[in-house]
UniProtKB/Swiss-Prot annotation:
Its EC number is 3.1.11.2. The gene is xthA. The record marks D229 as: Important for catalytic activity. Mg(2+) 2 binds at D151, N153. It comes from Escherichia coli (strain K12). The record marks H259 as: Interaction with DNA substrate. This is Exodeoxyribonuclease III. Disulfide bonds: none annotated.
Length: 268
């Protein structure tokens, strides 16, 4: 069973990248983030013709997530319990039948946070991680197959930082988000529920693979970026992970997203 997570940075701007992902990877499940399209305007017909059940949770111009599944899900949930109409459309979940059992897939576009001293964005990021933590602890069991995927906007370890030592120190000094100590605490707490970072587990020493590259500084040309797009699997699912990677080929296409797709394959 193959999962692909991709921050598409505008679904209607990049159908060519989604088509390329389907053709190359033939995934069973695709999680898209930052679709940037209101539900009323979602290009359902165009996406469904790729051979998927399509579920989406979006708003005009910002944020937005979608799940594409080969198998028909048992259940789909949009947003966290307690989200109101004003909540940013950042998370969609599904329970999907498979040979691995019913897999709970949580696809999220996590807040970026901007910087420690931002009065709105940083607390919103902390709250989002707390909401996910609460959901795991109250709604799910760690001995069941669970996969959290998406643009999580945190680099879990220093191996996941590829912007140069000078920039790394400056970001920490100025409180810029992505690998602040507080953010690492949120991530560690999430992982301690019983999750495995599939890429890092398979590549414990790799320090030159990233998933986000800044457009402005042409970071992709020099492989300067951050690994912030993750697939986190519960232990029973992680034990079935046979392959995982970051697709630089898709990132190198014309008019690309600033993110590369990340993927993992599981077999019983």
């Amino acid at each position: 069973m193959k999962f692909v997570s991709f921050n598409i940075n505008g679904l209607r701007a990049r159908p060519h990248q989604l088509e390329a992902i389907v053709e190359k990877h033939q995934p069973d499940v695709i999680g898209l983030q930052e679709t940037k399209v209101h539900d009323d305007m979602f290009p359902l017909e165009e996406v469904a013709k790729l051979g998927y059940n399509v579920f989406y949770h979006g708003q005009k111009g910002h944020y937005g997530v979608a799940l594409l599944t080969k198998e028909t899900p048992i259940a789909v949930r949009r947003g966290f319990p307690g989200d109101d109409e004003e909540a940013q459309r950042r998370i969609i979940m599904a329970e999907i039948p498979s040979l691995l059992g019913n897999v709970t897939v949580i696809n999220g576009y996590f807040p970026q946070g901007e910087s420690r001293d931002h009065p709105i964005k940083f607390p919103a990021k902390a709250q989002f991680y707390q909401n996910l933590q609460n959901y795991l602890e109250t709604e799910l069991k760690r001995d069941n197959p669970v996969l959290i995927m998406g643009d999580m906007n945190i680099s879990p370890t220093d191996l996941d930082i590829g912007i140069g030592e000078e920039n790394r120190k400056r970001w920490l000094r100025t409180g810029k988000c992505s690998f602040l100590p507080e953010e690492r605490e949120w991530m560690d707490r999430l992982m301690s529920w019983g999750l495995v970072d599939t890429f890092r587990h398979a590549n414990p020493q790799t320090a030159d693979r990233f998933s986000w590259f800044d457009y402005r500084s042409k970071g992709f040309d020099d492989n300067r970026g951050l690994r912030i797009d993750l697939l986190l699997a519960s232990q029973p699912l992680a034990e079935c992970c046979v392959e995982t990677g970051i697709d630089y080929e898709i990132r190198s296409m014309e008019k690309p997203s600033d993110h590369a797709p990340v993927w993992a394959t599981f077999r019983r």
